[in-house]
A protein has these predicted regions:
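A common structural junction motif
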Residues: 328-332, 359-366
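Flexible glycine-rich surface loops and low-complexity tracts that mediate binding to linear polymers
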Residues: 454-468
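Short alpha-helices
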Residues: 19, 96-136, 141-153
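Accessory interdomain/linker segments of ATP-dependent helicases and helicase-like nucleic-acid enzymes
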Residues: 379-437
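Hydrophobic helix-and-loop "lid/oligomerization" segment in the mid-to-C-terminal part
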Residues: 1-60, 80, 131-355, 374, ...
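Beta-strand/loop nucleic-acid-binding surfaces
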Residues: 434-451
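Histidine/acidic-residue-rich, glycine-tolerant segments that coordinate divalent metal ions
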Residues: 64-117
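A residue-level signal for conserved active-site and pocket-lining positions in enzyme catalytic cores
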Residues: 62, 208, 392, 461
Length: 469
């Protein structure tokens, strides 16, 4: 059969295509792939793409990291003679698409004991099942665990149960990976220690950047290439996309903060902002930062041709999706879950929407929700040594649902204090008795003038041996 793999433009989608395409290639099948353009097509299947696939005479379309909610699109594929296998990990709606097979760990009739796999985790289960069916050796699917691990950690799924095993074993393979593209992007990220943090903060942003700012094809080609020069060029391109993403994000963030301060938006229960020329690919990241900074739900909209398209982020205890459901008469389209949403609205309805959303937040008594810091233990600086910090690594890999241990330190004296990165971050040295440690507070630079050398403070933080290059 002539096969095409239809994936998403994020790291989970890219790694899903990589694993399935590579596995099929080893079986003698040259499957092609299709990744939608984030800005022009959006997430998931769309009918024009399905019609293009049919026109190119594909017999079988396999979706990865998408498809579970694409009822109409798969119905159209059937009409055009393209058979479909859906593999996905997103929540299942009231009905399933009419596909040959629908593989989703969140199916209500699913007997598999773990529901929290990433999209690439579901693909891994598919190639594992195929390997068993074809009497292949275990190594024929286990060899892809390095790529599966990258997608799993990057998609911020809970790193518990099978995801913990995938990540733990996968990171071991990552350290000795034969994948030239993965080796190259790891080197470009500048991390000496290859752990979940290096993947989350070094590798994932670079792989995601091309999908946000251009087209995700380049990240996929990086994983599939065996050509040294091509890998070098693709890595350089991803680095350029990442720098562009950072600059664009900084511009939107500064613009958003200016709006908040000029219009006293932070006095509202929720922060809803709109801007011309805001890049749709990065406003979700900025919304996360606004929510983190003000501890309020935020929705950012980029305006174009009388339409606002945007992303929202919430705080624990406030269901953003439920709140939007109560305002849906003013919206063209919305989707997502309790903590993160996507939204489309006519520009003329934005002010009315802001008022309605504010009323919903008032009814939910959102002002009574306070930020909570979960502390694992209270310790002294004298308890810290290299062996103690290294012993925490037994709890790795850290990530969603398995956070780094958080410690409380009481009564520390500030020995030095300054801002870093143009006032963005806070750098301190802290003293207790004769013990001194250095500390960094990411995105806490605004506190630099609130404290001075000699002040006594309580600090909540995490411990690590600084290995960043």
């Amino acid at each position: 059969e002539k096969i095409i793999i239809y994936g998403d433009y994020d790291v989970d989608g890219i790694t899903s295509i990589t694993v399935l395409k590579s596995f099929l290639k080893d079986r003698g099948i040259d499957a092609k792939y299709y990744i939608p353009n984030r800005i022009e097509e959006g997430y998931g299947l769309n009918i024009p793409a399905v019609e293009k696939i049919a026109k190119e005479k594909y017999d079988l379309m396999i979706t990865v990291d998408c498809g579970i909610s694409c009822i109409e699109e798969i119905r159209r594929a059937n009409e055009l003679g393209v058979q479909t296998i859906v593999t996905d990990h997103h929540e299942v709606g009231e009905s399933l698409p009419e596909a040959l097979a629908v593989v989703d760990c969140k199916r209500k009739d699913n007997k598999y004991p773990f529901r929290e796999l990433a999209g690439v985790g579901v693909v891994f289960k598919l190639i594992q099942a195929l390997s068993i069916k074809l009497n292949l050796e275990e190594k024929e699917y286990l060899k892809y665990l390095d790529i599966v691990c990258i997608g799993t950690i990057s998609d911020i799924v809970p790193l518990v149960d099978e995801n913990r095993v995938i990540s733990k074993l996968g990171l071991m393979l990552v350290k000795q990976t034969k994948n030239m593209g993965l080796r190259s992007i790891l080197n470009a990220s500048g991390y000496k220690k290859i752990d979940s943090g290096a993947i989350s903060f070094g590798v994932a942003p670079r792989l995601n950047a091309c999908g946000r700012m251009g087209h995700a094809d380049e990240a996929l080609k990086l994983f599939l290439s065996n050509n040294v020069n091509e890998v070098y060029d693709l890595t350089a391109s991803l680095n350029d996309f990442n720098r562009l993403r950072q600059e664009t994000e900084k511009h939107i963030y500064e613009d958003a903060i200016k709006q908040i301060e000029e219009n006293n938006e932070d006095k509202n229960r929720a922060i809803i902002l709109a801007g011309n020329n805001w890049h749709h690919g990065v406003i979700g990241i900025v919304a996360s930062k606004i929510t983190e900074m003000y501890f309020k739900p935020s929705i950012l909209l980029c305006l174009e041709d009388g339409i606002g398209k945007g992303s929202g982020r919430s705080i624990p205890g406030f269901d953003l999706h439920d709140a939007l459901t109560k305002c849906q008469s003013l919206l063209e389209k919305f989707g997502g879950h309790a903590m993160a949403i996507g939204i489309t609205i006519k520009q003329e309805n934005i002010e009315k929407f802001k008022q309605e959303f504010e009323n919903v937040a008032k009814q939910e008594q959102i002002e009574n929700i306070i930020p909570i810091v979960n502390i694992d233990a209270k310790i002294n600086l004298s308890d810290i040594n290299k062996e103690m910090v290294e012993s925490l690594s037994m709890l790795e890999p850290f990530g969603e649902a398995n956070k780094m241990p958080v410690f409380l330190f009481k009564n520390l004296k500030i020995d030095s204090i300054r801002a870093l990165s143009e006032g963005k971050h806070l750098k301190l040295t802290l003293k207790q008795n004769n013990m001194i440690v250095s500390a960094i507070g990411f995105n806490l630079g605004k506190l630099v003038n609130d404290y001075k050398i000699g002040d006594k403070i309580d600090v909540v933080g995490m411990l690590e041996i600084n290995s960043f290059n």
